[in-house]
């Protein structure tokens, strides 16, 4: 798997994976723990770490992933929790960044995400939150988007 991830990274593909939902004592899970992958952990609406999130030096960044409202088959909805939902959130931010600046490499995208994240937990990068909670607006502004354009791109649909 490591060779496939390295090849994808070399071709310019930004790889994102959920850190896992096995708890603090779980070993790192792959592909999230691979150096070519952006490992994402989950937070709740109060920016607290999801209790069952995996932890470790490989965790890059956090995003909302607790009590996410999801559609179910038919016309109903349910609440769900997990680092996979946080990874989807980061995938959306990466899509916005690459739409604005498609020439960015995977490493550049990682730097944008981590440098614009808002620190949570222990000061600086840590095993729980990585660089902190991702910020789509700040990520877009950091690569040259005008604040009004970044705000429009990150605003929830009405």
Model-derived features with residue positions:
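Substrate-binding/active-site groove segments that recognize
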Residues: 59-60, 135
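A generic "binding-loop/recognition-motif" signal
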Residues: 45, 57, 64
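Hydrolase catalytic cores
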Residues: 13, 51, 65-146
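Structural recognition of the beta-strand scaffold that forms the well-ordered cores
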Residues: 14-18, 38-41, 60-63, 69-70
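Substrate-binding/access-modulating region of protease and related hydrolase catalytic domains
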Residues: 1-36, 46-49, 55, 73-81, ...
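Secreted peptidase-domain scaffold signal
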Residues: 20, 141-158
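Residues that line or immediately flank small-molecule/substrate-binding pockets and catalytic motifs
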Residues: 41-44, 116
């Amino acid at each position: 798997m490591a060779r496939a991830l390295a090849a994808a990274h070399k071709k310019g593909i930004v790889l994102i994976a959920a850190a896992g939902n096995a708890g603090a004592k779980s070993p790192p899970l792959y592909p999230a723990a691979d150096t070519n992958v952006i490992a994402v952990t989950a937070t709740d609406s109060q920016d607290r770490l999801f209790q069952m999130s995996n932890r470790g030096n490989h965790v890059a960044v956090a995003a909302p992933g607790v009590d996410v409202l999801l559609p179910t088959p038919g016309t109903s909805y349910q609440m769900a929790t997990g680092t996979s939902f946080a990874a989807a959130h980061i995938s959306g931010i990466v899509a916005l960044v690459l739409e604005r600046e498609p020439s960015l490499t995977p490493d550049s995208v990682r730097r944008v995400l981590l440098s614009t994240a808002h620190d949570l937990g222990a000061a600086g990068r840590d095993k729980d939150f990585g660089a902190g909670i991702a910020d789509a607006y700040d990520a877009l502004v950091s690569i040259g988007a005008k604040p009004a354009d970044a705000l429009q791109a990150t605003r929830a649909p009405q």
